[in-house]
A protein has these predicted regions:
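Iron-sulfur cluster-binding electron-transfer modules in prokaryotic oxidoreductases
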Residues: 1-201
Length: 201
């Protein structure tokens, strides 16, 4: 069975554990393509592993390549904004996700700002993490909702770590804002057979 990619160990300076985990995974990932749902794992596999001849792809990027969005839900009638994970910088995933959200939802552009998560950074430097996170929260005060009852909208991302941090930051306020992984947003719409609701609270 595959194990942790080893990035937490590597960033903690435990190269020995990271190498051990990497060797286990490299024995398993003898295939053409490895799909990830986490940008940090993606970066670790793509840059630190020796996966010769193996493509490492974000799951949404893979879906776009094999279906060109044809299998994905269109017309998801809700407001969205995209939070770009820091480890997605330099990859194709952010632009692909933004293009889909712009075509399928009432998309609101927001600045690319770190959420302050950073994996173990949150636990080692909680005060600094919160300070960085508040900068992210400030960008979610959209002008359209600042002087009215807030419309529910989704902050969409492709990183589970960013999701946890954003949910934590939103837990003390900003009602009407929800956090969803891009794959969950699509899955929700498919399960219900109708668009994700666009509601007011």
């Amino acid at each position: 069975e595959q194990v942790c990619c080893g990035m937490p160990a590597l960033l903690s300076g435990d190269e020995q554990s990271a190498d051990k985990l990497g060797r286990i995974n490299q024995e398993i990932f003898k295939t053409e393509t490895v799909i990830t749902v986490c940008p940090t794992c993606n970066r670790m596999l793509a840059e630190e592993y020796e996966l010769k001849g193996v493509r490492v792809m974000d799951a949404f990027e893979f879906l776009n390549e094999v279906s060109n969005f044809q299998l994905l839900t269109s017309n998801i009638q809700t407001r969205t904004a995209y939070h770009q994970p820091c480890h997605s910088a330099g990859t194709k995933a952010p632009e692909i996700i933004k293009a889909f959200l712009k075509a399928s939802t009432d998309y609101q552009e927001i600045d690319d700002v770190c959420c302050g998560g950073g994996g173990l950074f949150t636990f080692k430097y909680p005060e600094l993490s919160d300070m960085i996170g508040q900068r992210r929260m400030e960008t979610l005060l959209l002008p359209e909702t600042s002087n009215m009852k807030p419309v529910t909208f989704y902050v969409v991302t492709n990183c589970p770590g960013c999701m946890m941090q954003l949910e934590y930051l939103l837990s003390s306020g900003k009602q009407g804002i929800r956090v969803r992984h891009i794959l969950n947003l699509i899955t929700d719409a498919h399960k219900t057979g109708c668009p994700v609701p666009h509601t007011q609270e």
